[in-house]
Amino acid sequence: MAKTLARSTASRITKRLISTSGATTPSPSYILSRRSTPVFSHAVGFISSLNRFTTIRTRMDRSGGSYSPLKSGSNFSDRAPTEMAPLFPGCDYEHWLIVMDKPGGENATKQQMIDCYVQTLAKIIGSEEEAKKKIYNVSCERYFGFGCEIDEETSNKLEGLPGVLFILPDSYVDQENKDYGAELFVNGEIVQRPPERQRKIIELTTQRTNDKPKYHDKTRYVRRRENMR
């Protein structure tokens, strides 16, 4: 049943992306890198090469309104292992990677992209000042997106906002330093890492981009949601 449900969900996502972009499915081996690439190409490239995640968020039809993603509490340590098995170190469902398409529009500057990230998160939490506090990293080159610290229920509200492609549970790039990678973003400003840590982040990011995915099971997040009902 789970496999059938996963295949059905993946099919719906693929059809929606194709109808949105009108592009054919390529076979890229790199993370999002060019702003001119169609939406579907971005999506496939990101998923096929980013081995930090086992699944994209898939929205399930839930009748009856009884499902609550946070019914076991907001802290990872409070949740039963069967409900909240971590996929990777740092993957606590409190840190989310929001992947976007063409933030700020065509030919946007880096600052315009960052402003778009802040404005996008502000739409669901109330203010840009609060959004700046919640965003912990930004990416404007290897892929377009930002990391934010919000609970799972709040993360659900990002789906469907303009420019939002995927909502992914984030995980550490540098486990030793509990670092999620990309460019550090603190209170609305990019903060530079110490040179040694920055070199390590670059090495780890490059290595993970080139490695084949370690996990091929795309249904774990779906199964987790099913277990939490």
UniProtKB/Swiss-Prot annotation:
A biological process (GO) of this protein is: mRNA processing
For the keyword Metal-binding, the answer is: no
Q: Which GO terms describe its molecular function?
A: protein dimerization activity; protein homodimerization activity
Any one annotated GO CC term = chloroplast
Q: What functional role does this protein have?
A: Involved in organellar RNA editing. Required for the processing of few RNA editing sites in mitochondria.
Query: Where does the record say this protein resides?
Result: Mitochondrion; Plastid, Chloroplast
Q: InterPro entries from the xrefs?
A: MORF/ORRM1/DAG-like, MORF/ORRM1/DAG-like_MORF, S8pro/Inhibitor_I9_sf
What binding partners and quaternary form does the record give?
Answer: Homodimer and heterodimers with MORF8/RIP1, MORF3/RIP3, MORF6/RIP6, MORF7/RIP7 and MORF9/RIP9.
Its main subcellular localisation, reduced to a broad class, is mitochondrion
Gene for this protein?
MORF5
Give the residue range annotated as the organelle targeting sequence: 1-57
Tell me the protein family, please: Belongs to the MORF family.
Any idea what this protein is called? Answer: Multiple organellar RNA editing factor 5, chloroplastic/mitochondrial
- Which cysteine pairs make disulfide bonds? none
What UniProt keywords apply to this chain's record, in alphabetical order? Chloroplast, Mitochondrion, mRNA processing, Plastid, Transit peptide
**What is the deletion mutant like?**
No visible phenotype under normal growth conditions.
